[in-house]
């Protein structure tokens, strides 16, 4: 069972309130080794992913894809995430997250190699399939480490701190990408391709790092004995309002796969005529809010509840999309990028809340189940965005996203607050 020692937890929060750099170091240093090693692993992985994130839609289009084909490619690429989501959660519970991290990094390495060697947009589909497979495995395993190593009352704070520290490389990677793209020829295939070769080298180094340094979290030592189907039934028997939560998370994930990964950078480049440095600046700007507010918002979520923080962060993210649509210059695009960072803050809070809706031993299955539905969103969202872009107009993509986020907030009203309770075992 999770410890509930109130006084030490209050002290942890006070430690993070003053002299934040020193206190953050103390907070991290007293955590278990798997938590600290995972932070370094995620920081490296995040750097490599954000190196190409803003430029990937432009790269695929430069290989010959139209706006609709861009959506189709990303949608097909999401099939692997759907196929692997539930088994990965179950395997993480049964065999541990270390093996999942190794497989995930290997898949992302191979996906990066396929991107680097692609000569047409159709080849990119295979790269997306394999890369998304690795990303799905990583996304499922990573929060299990935090859920296993952090105490209940400090979870949102700890996850916010983890998000802050691992996001720091994301401040420099888009700028590095912009410099390299400019050096190698601009926003075209030859200019963007070298970034994927850098990913190949980087993921190779992370793979070695996991092999040498990562050990299984102690609290994950429990092995499940039931079969796959029985274990999923157990999840819904012992979880709290999981059906409503899964629907909420699915709606909340649409911006990532329709906007952030596909149509925000494509819209900025094609409609607003943003160059490589503006695209990179938007990506860098999106990390400003996570870096400055992750810890304060984590503490706030621990104190006043996760739901209120989610209402706030989701609303500001919707405002960022309106700024993007109505931007008349690069300054407005950069401001939109700053506010888009609130989607990252919302995802951290959702992760903390997810970990409190099920018993600790079921975390792998919980995040695996969410991964299944995220995968479905990954399939449907890009092609849906492509249809909207082609049939109605580019701006309609973002109006629909805003409407769906408003709907998600109404759904959140039906969920119980989790920050002061743990593990209701009634089926809902």
Report residues per predicted region.
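Structural signature of the two symmetry-related core transmembrane helices
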Residues: 99-114, 308-323, 402
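Intracellular juxtamembrane helix-capping segments at the cytosolic ends
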Residues: 137-150, 345-358
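Helix-to-loop junctions at the C-terminal end of transmembrane segments
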Residues: 84-96, 181, 292-305, 389
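Helix-loop boundary and gating motifs at the non-cytosolic
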Residues: 21-83, 241-283
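Helix-loop junctions on the cytosolic side of multi-pass membrane transporters
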Residues: 209-224, 413-425
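Symmetry-related core transmembrane helices of the 12-TM Major Facilitator Superfamily/SLC fold
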Residues: 193-211, 397-413
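Juxtamembrane intracellular "pre-TM" segments in multi-pass secondary transporters
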Residues: 2-5, 10-35, 215-247, 428
